[in-house]
Amino acid sequence: MKKANKLELKEARHMVLAAVRKATEIGVPETVCVVDDGGYPIVLERMDGARITGPQIAWNKAFTASGHKRSTHLFNAQPNGPALPGNEAFGIQLSFEGRFAIFVGGFPIVVDDEVIGGIGLSGGNGEQDTRCGVAALEALRELLAPQGLTVLAQADIKK
C-alpha cells in the first residue's frame, strides 16, 4: 500500500495567505481556492471587492488543476494545447457540467512529485492570477522544506 502526503488545512491556509498578500501588493482583489486531491475545497477566500463570480471560477480552476494534474492555461497553450480546435481534448471544457477550466489561473500542488491538490485564482488578468498562484506555491515550498519535502513552485506544471 502506498503512503501519500495529504494537504491539510494549515498548509492550505498558508497558501491562501501568501496569495492574498501578493494580490494586495499588486492591487488586485482575488478569490483563492485550495482543493484536495479529490477536487474539493479546503479553503476558499474572496477578498473584499472581488467579483461575486470569483468563488466558482477559482474552485473550477483548482478542481481542474488537481484532477488533470496540469496548470489550466496549458490546455490552450499554442501551438499544441490539447483543448485547441482540432486537438485531442477540444471541447473538454464542457465536461464535468462545465466545471473544467481551460484558462489561466489553476495550478496543481505537487509535493515530492505527487499531485496532492490544486489552487485556483480568479480576479486578476492572467499574469496577476499567475503571480498570486506562484506566490502561494512558493510559500508552501518554504513551509515544507524543513520537513525535507519538495514543492513545484512555477507556472507551467504538467504531471
PLM region spans:
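Flexible, solvent-exposed loop/hinge segments and secondary-structure transition points
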Residues: 1-159
